[in-house]
Amino acid sequence: MSQKSDLRNRIIFTLFLLVLARLGIFIPVPGIDHDAFYASVEKNTLVNFLNIFSGGGFSTIGIFALGIVPYINSSIVMQLLTKIVPNLEKLQKEEGELGRQKITQITRYLALGWATLQSGAISIWVKPYVFNWNFAFVCESVLALTAGSMIIMWLSELITEKGIGNGASLLIFQNIVSGLPKNFTQSFFDASYSNASLKFGLFIAIFLLMIIITICVQEGTRRIKIISARQLGKSSILDPNSYLPLKLNQGGVMPIVFASASMALPSYLTQIIQNKTLLQILYLFCPNGSLYLLLYCALILFFSYFYTSIVMNPEDIAINLKKMGASIPNIRPGQATIDYLQVILNRLTFLGASFLFTVALIPFIIEKVTQIQNLRGLGATSLLILVGVAIDTAKQIQTYVISKKYDSMTK
């Protein structure tokens, strides 16, 4: 099979699986008054956030409503556990492919448990909208939603293995893109807005500018020069191609995802808590509350440092440099290298978090200026995911083409 046809088949296979994943959202769980439920949750902050990842599945309660969320949550938990539990860390680092397969299997079991819990919570949550709520309905809905989530997880792994790109990321990308037309129409083609065309044009310009800035920051790196013992013996001039790249935004989209999920919780609690004092406190942290933006920025900063500490360990970098016989010019190997890298990472993390602040606040600023109330669905979380997945997929296609060229040259 030729290189072009193989790539084309992978792309077609990926698109086919994405279409299958999308169709399942429109197959409703039986026994629910879906019209009444949709009317009730249309303005719910928590549901709107979850819809970003499910493509509107939480508004319709389709069999694929949970989407890839349980698998992603389980993957995040496993990332944390591999840093905390020594046996899991050893399994990941020292046992090679077999160890990674075991961790993947544990992640799947966690995803199954997570999906079951979420399905049970949803079956209780929709109780007011169920025609005949009983134990049989709970079992049926839990089985349908959990099975749907497991099918999505399977499709995700198929895309990663036999298609092109990362399956989980592409599924989220598809769900976000599917919600953009609705957000645009709700925002700009409502009769209550004056000068809709002008506001639409202004928003498109700002949105494109945000995309350009996001690409620049997502691709931005700090290059730290390194030199090997072999180079040091040959020349005093540093090789410009020998450097350690540290990304400006190490955490990627995860800090803002965690922060957004946390900030959606107060809005959900206001619907189930009756105490007036607690309600007044919770309203301060709701989207229109006086402390919302302050806490939002603080959480983004916290999760940026937290996630960077998980994905980038200065001690591991220093050890690997020592094993390779390389060092940073004018920095002694060992603890001095660790301290130097930690300072650099702290500065980069602060700059990356500041960028996330800016992108996260722009939708709120536009809403205040234009009085358009539906822009947060097009905000920082969605934008960062869209740009990040698009860049990553393009790089994977490029890498695949290059690897195939090398394979054909060596045959």
Swiss-Prot record:
GO annotation, cellular component aspect: chloroplast thylakoid membrane
Residues passing through the membrane, by range: 11-31, 52-72, 111-131, 135-155, 163-180, 197-217, 253-273, 291-311, 349-369, 377-397
Domain of life: Eukaryota
Subcellular location: Plastid, Chloroplast thylakoid membrane
PROSITE patterns given in the database record: SECY_1 (PS00755), SECY_2 (PS00756)
Described function: The central subunit of the protein translocation channel SecYE. Consists of two halves formed by TMs 1-5 and 6-10. These two domains form a lateral gate at the front which open onto the bilayer between TMs 2 and 7, and are clamped together by SecE at the back. The channel is closed by both a pore ring composed of hydrophobic SecY resides and a short helix (helix 2A) on the extracellular side of the membrane which forms a plug.
Entries under HAMAP family matching the protein: SecY (MF_01465)
Family: Belongs to the SecY/SEC61-alpha family.
Quaternary structure note: Component of the plastid Sec protein translocase complex, which is composed of at least SecY, SecE and SecG.
Name of the featured protein: Protein translocase subunit SecY
Designated gene of the protein: secY
